[in-house]
């Protein structure tokens, strides 16, 4: 399947564009020999960072081994000098959720059939050591527009490979579908996909999600607590068996959560003709229409924001005669409106045009949504303003860096305040250090520092961390380097400031960041009223 030498153009004719991402475009293509149609994801590898390239290789590796009727299949993977081509099934049926609202009849039994196909794909993934991590409506497609077309799971860009003896720590997924263990930054594995299935099944039955809040922090608090319910009247007509399955999927403790294989054996799924209700659910269809409209509106807003940022960097690079290394572009509103007198590069013009098209689509979606609101949407519609935006490991890395800066500042504050209890909670008992007070010796453990906490408690000391630079070293380790300013009063009450360069290595153990090494470069002070250690 992997072809590293044959040119893509030698085997495929490229047709119209089907979609576009930050560093890739999806086009319909036709195999020259067989005449079969496919969807080619074309990635510009010149614009990828080393981390992004690793993700691409991981996605291709995972997709190559997944061969299932309910998964969008990868048929070919071709690496060329500047581009990588992933050739997938061409699925023409659109999103599952969009198809449901166009149906004349939709029942609980239909929802059972939908979730069964999703669970079949997830069970297959899990049996092959793959966790999808981004189950959501946008990634549930239909093979064709034919009645009864198979549901296809798509987009394995965030998928990971795991085994039964290991867990993952990366923060990835889409907010409304994230599991409690991911939000708590606990180790996680296959059960995260089952939680997302529970959210999807809830939506399939009533047309709105189980967790909702306009404030993302409150949304996350709901999810971590598993705080959802079955309000009347829409849930009164749902069978107890369906609610029981949702409860088993939305179990906060991942160890007690039902597995995909177990869920497939539940009578509501494997014997739906006898257990699931066959009554048409018009209210669900109506709510789902509004749910879809909100998803599309938010996607358009995200597209406008992304393209605006991207086109501005391109504008900047064009005016300076250089190209941004990450390939992103951004520009201001006046340039979009055409009020700038500066000449525009062809690439910038394309970015501006894309922004204008996205803005037009956004306006149309906004009008449609307003029209739907005027028709009187039910008060039970629930959707978070953030719930459709996918979070990947890059977002996780930003959050991880912020955590490192925060915990480092807390440690410095503990030193300034002579708070040895907090200091010991933040430092590993075997922490090593190089510092002037040790006269060039490598010190192990924290007892050496106790002396500085026990003495001079009345000194006023304030520490400021400047320009922290965090390097992430895997999932459980990080290094931070910074300039430290220490302000203090001497015995005569005169203020002094001392500057030093410091670096700390942090390791996450049992869910907590602990400092395992510190190195500080400065001359020991002749003034003994304060130590910086």
UniProtKB/Swiss-Prot annotation:
Ordered alphabetically, the record's keywords are: ATP-binding, Calmodulin-binding, Cell projection, Cytoplasm, Kinase, Magnesium, Metal-binding, Nucleotide-binding, Phosphoprotein, Serine/threonine-protein kinase, Stress response, Transferase
**Region Disordered, annotated ranges:** 316-347, 369-400
List the cofactors: Mg(2+)
User: Looking at the keywords, is Repeat present?
Assistant: no
What SUPFAM superfamilies does this protein map onto?
NTF2-like (SSF54427), Protein kinase-like (PK-like) (SSF56112)
Any single Gene Ontology cellular-component annotation: neuron projection
Q: What is this protein called?
A: Calcium/calmodulin-dependent protein kinase type II
Q: Which organism is it from?
A: Caenorhabditis briggsae
- The gene it comes from is unc-43
């Amino acid at each position: 399947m992997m072809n590293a030498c044959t040119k893509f153009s030698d085997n495929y004719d490229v047709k119209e564009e089907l979609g576009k991402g930050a560093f890739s475009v999806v086009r319909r293509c036709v195999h020259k020999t067989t005449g079969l149609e496919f969807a080619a994801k074309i990635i510009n590898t010149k614009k990828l960072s080393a981390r992004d390239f690793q993700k691409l290789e991981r996605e291709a590796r995972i997709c190559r081994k997944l061969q299932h009727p309910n998964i969008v299949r990868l048929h070919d993977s071709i690496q060329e000098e500047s581009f990588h081509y992933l050739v997938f099934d061409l699925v023409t049926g659109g999103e599952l959720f969009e198809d449901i609202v166009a149906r004349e009849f939709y029942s609980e039994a239909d929802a059972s059939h939908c979730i069964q196909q999703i669970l079949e794909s997830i069970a297959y993934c899990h049996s092959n050591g793959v966790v999808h991590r981004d189950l959501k409506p946008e990634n549930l497609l239909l093979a064709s527009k034919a009645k009864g077309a198979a549901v296809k799971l798509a987009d394995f860009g965030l998928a990971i490979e795991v085994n039964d003896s290991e867990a993952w720590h990366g923060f990835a997924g889409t907010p409304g579908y994230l599991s409690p263990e991911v939000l708590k930054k606990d180790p996680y594995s296959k059960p995260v996909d089952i939680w997302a299935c529970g959210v999807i099944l809830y939506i399939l039955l009533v047309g709105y999600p189980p967790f909702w809040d306009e404030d993302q922090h409150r949304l996350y608090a709901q999810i971590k607590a598993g705080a959802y319910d079955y309000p009347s009247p829409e849930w009164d007509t749902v069978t107890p068996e369906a609610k029981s399955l949702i409860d088993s999927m939305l179990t906060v403790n991942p160890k007690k959560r039902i597995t995909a294989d177990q869920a497939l054996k539940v009578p509501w799924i494997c014997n739906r003709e006898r257990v699931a209700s066959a009554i048409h659910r018009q209210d669900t269809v109506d709510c789902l229409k509004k749910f879809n409209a909100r998803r599309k509106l938010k996607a358009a807003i995200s597209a406008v924001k992304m393209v605006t940022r991207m086109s501005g960097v391109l504008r900047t690079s064009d005016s300076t005669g250089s190209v941004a290394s990450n390939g992103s572009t951004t520009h201001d509103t006046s340039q979009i409106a055409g009020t700038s007198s500066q000449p525009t590069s062809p690439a910038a013009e394309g970015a501006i045009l894309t922004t204008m098209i996205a803005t037009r689509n956004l306006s149309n979606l906004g009008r449609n949504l307003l029209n739907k609101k005027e028709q009187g949407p039910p008060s039970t519609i629930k959707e978070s303003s953030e719930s459709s935006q996918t979070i990947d490991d890059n977002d996780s890395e930003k959050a991880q860096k912020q955590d490192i800066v925060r915990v480092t500042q807390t440690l410095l504050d503990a030193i300034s305040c002579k708070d040895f209890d907090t200091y010991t909670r933040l430092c590993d008992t075997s922490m090593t250090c190089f510092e002037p007070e040790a006269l060039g010796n490598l010190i192990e453990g924290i007892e050496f520092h106790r002396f500085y906490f026990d003495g001079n408690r009345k000194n006023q000391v304030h520490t400021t961390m400047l320009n922290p630079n965090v390097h992430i070293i895997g999932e459980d380790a990080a290094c931070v380097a910074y300039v430290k300013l220490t302000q203090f009063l001497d015995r005569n009450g005169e203020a002094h400031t001392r500057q030093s360069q410091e670096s700390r290595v942090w390791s996450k153990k049992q869910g907590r960041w602990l400092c395992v090494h510190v190195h500080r470069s400065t001359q020991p002070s002749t003034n003994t009223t304060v130590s910086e250690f």
